[in-house]
Amino acid sequence: MSFEVPDDRRYLESHEWVTTGGDTVRIGVSDFAQDELGDVVFVELPEAGDEITAGEAFGVVESIKAVSDLYAPVSGEVVAVNEELFDRPELVNEDPYGDGWLLEVEPVEGGDAEGLLDADEYDDQIA
């Protein structure tokens, strides 16, 4: 099975993605992750103004199969949360790189997680 892996973002081995460039970045979970999770039924996220730390858990996604921690690909301040997910968590499954995004973060300089993968490296990992 082939999964979508956009090349305009970086990935953690734990299957979170982060957009690159700009004053703020967007974070979500990969197509592979949403497929492995199955139907997402609940998402727990931090609030705007909270700080997240690269490589550490910042939230939880719950599916019919499992409860999984979400890990931060960057350190910074949460500036927006996708509140649509509280009513429609299935957006994580339906559009993991679009409407199913999780957070927008203002990253701190040098705050990337260790071992962020580019699209080719991540694609090799999930192959």
UniProtKB/Swiss-Prot annotation:
Source species of the chain: Halorubrum lacusprofundi (strain ATCC 49239 / DSM 5036 / JCM 8891 / ACAM 34)
Write out the similarity annotation. Answer: Belongs to the GcvH family.
Name any GO cellular component annotation: glycine cleavage complex
Per the entry, the cofactor note is:
Binds 1 lipoyl cofactor covalently.
Extract the InterPro entries matched here: 2-oxoA_DH_lipoyl-BS, Biotin_lipoyl, GCV_H, GCV_H/Fam206, GCV_H_sub, Single_hybrid_motif
Ranges for domain Lipoyl-binding come to: 24-106
Protein's job? The glycine cleavage system catalyzes the degradation of glycine. The H protein shuttles the methylamine group of glycine from the P protein to the T protein.
* Keywords recorded for this protein, A-Z: Lipoyl
What GO biological process term is on the record, naming one? glycine decarboxylation via glycine cleavage system
Pfam families for this protein = GCV_H
User: What protein am I looking at?
Assistant: Probable glycine cleavage system H protein
Assembly behavior? The glycine cleavage system is composed of four proteins: P, T, L and H.
Does this entry carry the keyword Methyltransferase? no
PANTHER family, A to Z:
GLYCINE CLEAVAGE SYSTEM H PROTEIN, GLYCINE CLEAVAGE SYSTEM H PROTEIN-RELATED
Per the record, residues carrying N6-lipoyllysine are K65
Which cofactors must be present for this protein to function? Answer: (R)-lipoate
